[in-house]
């Protein structure tokens, strides 16, 4: 008869006792020091770490400890993922794969893993993920329902949480998520949008801090009337950036929102940028002839890098390789972001079967079509693709 021993944490020896059994082969038991368990758990996939919480209360406590969650996030930052999501069959599905597989010159195929599914009643477009968490990008605009729920989710652990209703007398609400690495704090910025003839601007700016117990929106002051675009946000070193237009002058600009101080700053743009990117830790922007998309007919794009000291943009032009036309063809793609040192990822707007993304090595100026397998045979759905996604085991509180 095999006798099971319970798992327990020995407070005296600070060691985790692993389940053992006693039988005809004798006793087989052992303890692992907590620091060794932390080392092991910080290296497993986030999906596995989330499941390990069910092993026991002691494992759950260990996996929720700030030291382990911070160590996991630090190590996960060195192994970023490609993240893909779309809505189909009554749910939103999330898929990911290690990013380095896209850069593999010996393979044109990447198999993704299904992380989680979210019920369809969470109607949303999604913001760029920040340190492992994602947020709805807007309420009502996509769903056309005033009762559409906004949410925050962690694709790696499968956890999602509703956000409080936004206090608003307007119809449309747009949101962004940011992270302050110093205080290790997530915040969600939202604003209501007024859209009248010749009168476009954001009003009722509000912010919500995660991990503070009861979630609550707080009103903010913003000194410049502007209209934010529904795309192109990025968070770099505790500063959230998003594209916008001044309400009165119709001038293009980039708005920066500092997570710690909760204040807005405004950076003039010389032209309308298609999207914002993280370029080696600096704010970058992309501009091309067709706002929002590119296809095989494009011959190049402009890369804009912000000079932080002078608050000016530095422009460079990248000419696409001749084979771009044949590889991309008539597929409409958008600039997802930069991985590695100088590798660009492009993605279609709509899911196809088979589904492909495109990898441009800016150093060698070579373009590769990469097939993504594992997302199923569905096609025709709007698809959201992200790079530099970091797995995170932190619970949404």
Curated annotation (Swiss-Prot):
Residues 26-75 form the F-box domain. InterPro entries: F-box-assoc_dom_typ3 (IPR013187), F-box-assoc_interact_dom (IPR017451), F-box-like_dom_sf (IPR036047), F-box_dom (IPR001810). PROSITE patterns: FBOX (PS50181). SMART domains: FBOX (SM00256). It comes from the Eukaryota. This is F-box protein At3g49450. It comes from Arabidopsis thaliana.
């Amino acid at each position: 008869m095999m006798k099971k021993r319970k798992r327990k944490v020995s407070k005296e020896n600070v060691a985790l006792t692993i389940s053992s059994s006693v039988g005809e082969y004798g006793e087989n038991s052992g303890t692992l020091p907590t620091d060794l368990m932390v080392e092991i758990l910080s290296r497993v996939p986030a999906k596995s770490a989330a499941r390990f919480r069910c092993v026991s209360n002691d494992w759950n406590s260990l996996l929720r400890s700030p030291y382990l969650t911070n160590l996991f996030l630090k190590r996960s930052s060195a192994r970023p993922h490609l993240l893909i999501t779309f809505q189909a069959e009554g749910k939103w599905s999330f898929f990911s794969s290690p990013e380095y597989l896209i850069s593999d010159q010996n393979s044109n195929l990447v198999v993704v893993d299904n992380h989680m599914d979210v019920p369809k009643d969470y109607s949303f477009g999604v913001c760029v993920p920040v340190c492992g968490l994602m947020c709805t990008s807007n309420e009502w605009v996509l769903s056309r329902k005033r009762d559409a729920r906004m949410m925050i989710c962690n694709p790696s652990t499968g956890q999602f949480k509703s956000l409080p209703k936004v206090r608003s007398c307007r119809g449309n609400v747009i949101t962004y998520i940011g992270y302050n690495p110093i205080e290790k704090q997530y915040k969600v910025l939202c604003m209501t949008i007024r859209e009248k003839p010749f009168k476009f601007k954001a009003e009722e700016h509000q912010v919500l801090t995660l991990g503070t117990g009861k979630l609550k929106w707080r009103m903010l002051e913003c000194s410049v009337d502007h209209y934010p675009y529904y795309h192109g946000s990025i968070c770099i070193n505790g500063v959230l950036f998003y594209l916008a237009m001044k309400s009165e002058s119709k001038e293009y600009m980039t708005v920066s929102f500092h997570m710690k101080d909760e204040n807005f700053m405004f950076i003039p743009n010389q032209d309308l940028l298609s999207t914002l990117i993280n370029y080696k830790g600096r704010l970058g922007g992309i501009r091309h002839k067709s706002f929002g998309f590119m296809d095989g007919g494009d011959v190049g794009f402009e890369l804009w890098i912000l000079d932080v000291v002078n608050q000016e943009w530095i422009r460079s032009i990248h000419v696409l390789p001749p084979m771009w036309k044949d590889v991309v063809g008539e597929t409409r793609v958008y600039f997802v972001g930069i991985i590695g040192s100088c590798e660009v990822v492009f993605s279609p707007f709509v899911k196809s079967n088979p589904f492909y993304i495109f990898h441009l090595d800016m150093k060698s100026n070579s373009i590769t079509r990469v097939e993504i397998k594992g997302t199923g045979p569905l096609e025709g759905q709007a698809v959201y693709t992200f790079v530099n996604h970091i797995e995170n085991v932190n619970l949404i509180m």
